[in-house]
Design a protein with these regions (language model features):
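Conserved beta-ketoacyl condensing-enzyme motif
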Residues: 2-24, 94-110, 180-182
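Flexible glycine-/small-residue-enriched beta->alpha junction loops
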Residues: 2-58
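N-terminal extracellular/periplasmic Venus flytrap/periplasmic-binding protein-like
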Residues: 69-161
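Helix-loop junctions at the membrane interface of multi-pass solute transporters
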Residues: 57-63, 80, 84
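Active-site pocket-shaping loop/turn-to-helix segments
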Residues: 9, 14, 43-51, 61-75, ...
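Glycine- and Gly-Pro-enriched alpha-helical subdomains that act as flexible
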Residues: 154-183
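Phosphate/pyrophosphate-binding loops at sites that engage ATP/ADP/AMP, CoA/4′-phosphopantetheine
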Residues: 59, 63-64, 159-163
Length: 183
């Protein structure tokens, strides 16, 4: 069984454990919505602790990608995603999941990220959110969403023996990576 939850809307503020029983002075409190909870100085020196939005700023600076180009790309991305959903192109890739809300059951079957109503004007009106004087906004970056996923991975024999009907099959895997400051 593999699972995970990310609740960006309810990420807590965290205070690290003090080094001694009754510390004097002020304690540092971390906002855990973006980035690391408790920064290890050695890890920070080696890899950085930038959030995804900050790494996008690093890439924009490194490759000299202007704000207008980012907004145009974001608009096209939203338009393509909305069109793909409308045309049913994700039908074979997304498994609708029933979720109980009290006595009612709803079917979660679509990503809420793509904005049907966005425009270049709306994107241009947004302020940078990750860096003073930056170019990455809430409209041209990945959204901060709540989400969860779980998977039960079993063999065909196990599924048959227990009357399980597969929702998906693992056909292949791949691994790739880049330095953390430009992910």
């Amino acid at each position: 069984i593999g699972s995970g939850v990310e609740s960006m809307s309810r990420a807590p503020y965290a205070v690290p454990k003090p080094e001694r029983g009754f510390p004097t002075g002020n304690l540092v409190m971390y906002d855990t919505t973006l980035g690391w909870r408790f920064v290890n100085p050695k890890m920070q020196a080696l890899y950085g602790t930038e959030s995804m939005g900050e790494t996008a700023e690093n890439l924009a600076e490194m490759y000299k990608i202007p704000r207008e180009e980012q907004d145009r790309f974001a608009l096209l991305s939203h338009q393509k995603a909305v069109r793909a959903w409308d045309e049913g192109r994700f039908q074979d890739e997304v498994v609708p999941v029933p979720v109980k809300r009290g006595k009612e059951e709803i079917l979660v079957e679509q990503d809420e990220g793509p904005r049907r109503d966005t425009s270049l004007e709306k994107l241009a009106a947004l302020r940078p959110v990750f860096r003073e004087g930056g170019t990455v906004t809430a409209g041209n970056s990945s959204p901060l969403n709540d989400g969860a996923a779980a998977v039960l991975l079993v063999s065909d024999d196990y599924a048959k023996a227990h009357g399980l009907r597969p929702l998906a099959r693992v056909r292949a895997i791949a691994v790739a990576g880049v330095p953390p400051r430009i992910m």
